[in-house]
């Protein structure tokens, strides 16, 4: 069977290019030992660039455009212009020197741009590219169930996550719900929160229940997933404090119809299910309530959100 025959892609979807991935890698390397963490595929960087340089943004509908090659060169030149000043002021780790040289060579290599153009054209021919109204006019008119999944975890939200270890986008369920509202959908909606039966974090950032002795058992093969950009895969006990915080920033328990807890098969193999319900020690009253729960920031107004977006 042809898997691409089952795949439809909105023609207005933003395209993250490998050039944005190079920018993401270089920015992460420029932080030295102060890792922020990045998937490194350029998704967040392409979103930021689409806001700052909308005339250069590539959409899925552009993959077969006659001027695709020229537009990729324009994207490359733009990235080179904003990356270079950052690199001049950066204090790279000595052990990152080879990686920095490699990424810069890619950015200078016209052959790399030509390769991207070829592969993008191939992808454009394989993918079933559909109009933006396909969700409303086709998918939501079918019998059955449509599953809408957010692309990021709640705690990577750029307002309620833990700066600077956040995504460039908003990741709350209401962003996914907006897709349905924009499509004019008025039928039944079931909201499910989803979490693993244990905590896992890929890369830098706070991880109160992280346990280096349990990562290999809870997440087999995770040690082979390490890279310089995302960092180490860490695992630990399911964190009730962070789970309740994530639920609360989404609107509280009443915002959900249920909570799906996954990966119990791994817990069974590990032989022990560890849960954290409260943090010990003295907690910062500015961040925690007297009951030991994380305080939820107020949602930004439209004007405040515009400022946050402009600062990305």
Identify what each model region corresponds to.
Residues 1-312:
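Non-transmembrane, aqueous-exposed alpha-helical and coiled segments at domain scale
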């Amino acid at each position: 069977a042809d898997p691409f025959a089952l795949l439809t892609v909105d023609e207005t979807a933003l395209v993250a290019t490998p050039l944005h991935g190079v920018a993401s890698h270089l920015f992460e390397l420029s932080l030295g030992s102060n890792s922020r963490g990045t998937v490194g595929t350029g998704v967040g960087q392409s979103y930021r660039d689409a806001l700052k340089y909308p005339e250069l943004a590539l959409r899925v509908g552009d993959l077969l455009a006659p001027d695709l090659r020229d537009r990729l060169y324009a994207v490359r030149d733009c990235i080179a212009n904003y990356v270079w000043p950052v690199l001049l002021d950066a204090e790279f780790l000595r052990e990152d020197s080879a990686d920095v040289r490699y990424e810069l060579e890619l950015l200078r290599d016209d052959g790399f741009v030509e390769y991207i153009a070829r592969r993008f054209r191939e992808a454009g021919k394989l993918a079933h590219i559909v109009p933006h109204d396909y969700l409303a006019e086709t998918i939501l008119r079918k019998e059955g169930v449509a599953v809408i999944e957010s692309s990021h975890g709640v705690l990577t939200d750029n307002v309620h996550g833990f700066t600077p270890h956040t995504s460039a986008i908003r990741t709350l369920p209401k962003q996914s719900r907006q897709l349905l509202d924009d499509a004019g959908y008025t039928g039944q909606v079931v909201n499910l929160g989803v979490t693993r039966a244990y905590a896992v974090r890929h890369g830098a950032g706070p991880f109160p229940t992280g346990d280096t002795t349990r990562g290999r058992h809870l997440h087999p093969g995770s040690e082979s997933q390490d890279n310089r950009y995302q960092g180490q895969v860490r695992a630990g006990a399911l964190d009730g404090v962070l789970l309740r915080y994530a639920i609360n920033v989404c609107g509280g328990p009443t915002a959900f119809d249920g909570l799906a807890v996954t990966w119990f098969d791994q817990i069974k193999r590990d032989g022990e299910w560890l849960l954290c319900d409260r943090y010990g020690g003295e907690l910062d009253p500015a961040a925690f309530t007297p009951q030991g729960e994380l305080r939820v920031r107020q949602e930004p107004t439209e004007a405040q959100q515009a400022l946050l977006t402009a600062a990305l």
